[in-house]
Amino acid sequence: MHTAWQEILKEEKEKDYFIRLWDFVKTAYRETTVYPPKDRIFHAFDAVAPQDVRCVILGQDPYHGPNQANGLSFSVNDGVAIPPSLRNMYKELMSDLGCPAPTTGNLEAWSNQGVFLLNTSLTVEAGKAGSHAKKGWESFTDRVIEVLGQQEQPIVFILWGNHAKSKKSLIDTNRHLVLESVHPSPLSASRGFFGSRPYSQTNDWLQQQNRTPIDWCIS
């Protein structure tokens, strides 16, 4: 975790709920198979300090299949099949910006440019979607969203689906841009995700705010 995040979240990690959460997580890793790998739980916080975040893409759960989750929302490791929601994100990326088809599902290239890829739950038991929800992670990640929402520099928050949209109240919408649509999941993508142009909208707004746009194309 970047030192700036460590400092900001130090008090949060000392709260009773987080101590209980962390006890639960440690036990879960010991007794069951949990994703992502333990050293990747806070990977989203490694690459980018809060003051350098330009865009937040909010996910829900880590992937719950082998070798998929790497601590960044929607991202998978190199060499792993690109999951359906991410495939749809890429389809929209190609349509929106004319990017070539990405060959990897690894989104480190976005993270390294200040795209904060945050799940609202940071761990999950293998094969059991949502299994670590309501254990305390949401309180922790709500605090993270609040911290980002209080940053001086303007940030784009991308909220896909009802779960992500429910976090809008944590964000100062006078200072930041919130882009909302249905989730890129195959179940909903055709109902308003395709054609929503989140990538170009993000860059247009960042440039209006005198911030550097993001190179979204993934080679």
From Swiss-Prot:
Keywords, comma-separated and alphabetical: Cytoplasm, DNA damage, DNA repair, Hydrolase
Coiled coil: none
Entry annotation: catalytic residues: 61 (proton acceptor)
GO CC terms of this entry: cytoplasm
Intracellular or extracellular location(s): Cytoplasm
Molecular-function annotations in GO: uracil DNA N-glycosylase activity
EC code(s) of this entry: 3.2.2.27
Catalytic activity of the protein: Hydrolyzes single-stranded DNA or mismatched double-stranded DNA and polynucleotides, releasing free uracil
Pfam families xrefs: UDG (PF03167)
Keyword DNA damage set for record: yes
Domain of life assignment: Bacteria
Biological function: Excises uracil residues from the DNA which can arise as a result of misincorporation of dUMP residues by DNA polymerase or due to deamination of cytosine.
PANTHER family: URACIL-DNA GLYCOSYLASE (PTHR11264:SF0)
Protein name (database record): Uracil-DNA glycosylase
Lineage: Bacteria, Bacillati, Bacillota, Bacilli, Bacillales
